[in-house]
Curated annotation (Swiss-Prot):
Main location: cytoplasm
Organism from which the protein derives: Bos taurus (Bovine)
CDD domains referenced in this protein's UniProt entry, alphabetically: CRABP1
Keyword field contains Nucleotide-binding: no
GO molecular function terms listed in the Swiss-Prot or TrEMBL record: fatty acid binding; identical protein binding; retinal binding; retinoic acid binding; retinol binding
Entries under InterPro entries matching the protein: Calycin, Fatty_acid-bd, ILBP, Lipocln_cytosolic_FA-bd_dom
Cited Pfam families: Lipocalin (PF00061)
Similarity section: Belongs to the calycin superfamily. Fatty-acid binding protein (FABP) family.
Name of the featured protein: Cellular retinoic acid-binding protein 1
GO biological process: fatty acid transport
Record text about domains: Forms a beta-barrel structure that accommodates hydrophobic ligands in its interior.
Keyword terms, alphabetized: Cytoplasm, Retinol-binding, Transport, Vitamin A
GO annotation, cellular component aspect: cytosol; nucleus; protein-containing complex
Record has Transport as a keyword: yes
Amino acid sequence: MPNFAGTWKMRSSENFDELLKALGVNAMLRKVAVAAASKPHVEIRQDGDQFYIKTSTTVRTTEINFKVGEGFEEETVDGRKCRSLPTWENENKIHCTQTLLEGDGPKTYWTRELANDELILTFGADDVVCTRIYVRE
């Protein structure tokens, strides 16, 4: 069982602005979001398949609690409520599909993977993928 637990700081980010654009976020809000999310702090607690993930930025803090294999409610990157279903894609990677509770929008998902002491987080909106790499603090 991989150990995702710990505090993580972002080392690199690719395509975050493009992801927000694909989600329909306007230019001014994208600029604010990109600046605010440039140094997120992530805390993960794990007990087997049970996860608690807290992500803090200068403008927003999100917290999710879930068990791999069980659906839960959260918000997409742009703040829309969704039903999410996390599953183990492989022994070190969780893949989570998201279904909007209301309205239409791109097909979204996230993954979290441990590789070489790094946490690789991806967000997807249709065919646009944002990759963020974190290292332990």
